[in-house]
Amino acid sequence: MNAQNPYAATFAWMNNEVIPYLDQLPELSHAEFLRKLEAQLAKDLYPVEWGELSAEPTAQSIAAKLQQAVQELIQNHNNTLGQVLYRIDISEGKIRRLMASTTPEKRSEKLAFQLLEREAKKVWLRMNYR
């Protein structure tokens, strides 16, 4: 596992399942998409402190920060987790199924994927239709 990014292996799915949106944005740069994605996540994950936004975020750095933020939400802000998920627009049914079918160790990873997928769609739509 990479010492700089301990979540690199965990988020191997990111390049295959979220980043394809980038191919649909030929006139916009991947870097712009990633900057907007990171900013959207930082905004929507309140009360978790995201930290400083990167001038040049990578998919891996976003994934690592997101995994940490989700873990903090689960451990320290569990009563506001539902509000965050509602604000991001992840269905209650989807979350219930995820929680019931996933081991506690994998919940933050699966939940992070749901958040990332939804936020990436939101950013992609804004970039494509504004």
Give the residues covered by each predicted segment.
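Conserved phosphate/pyrophosphate-binding and hydrolysis machinery centered on Walker-type P-loop NTPases
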Residues: E27, A31, E52, E56-Q60, ...
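Amphipathic alpha-helical interaction modules
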Residues: Q40-Q83
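N-terminal leader/targeting peptides and immediately adjacent processing regions
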Residues: M1-A42
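Amphipathic alpha-helical binding modules
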Residues: I95-R130
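Amphipathic protein-protein interaction modules
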Residues: Q67-E109
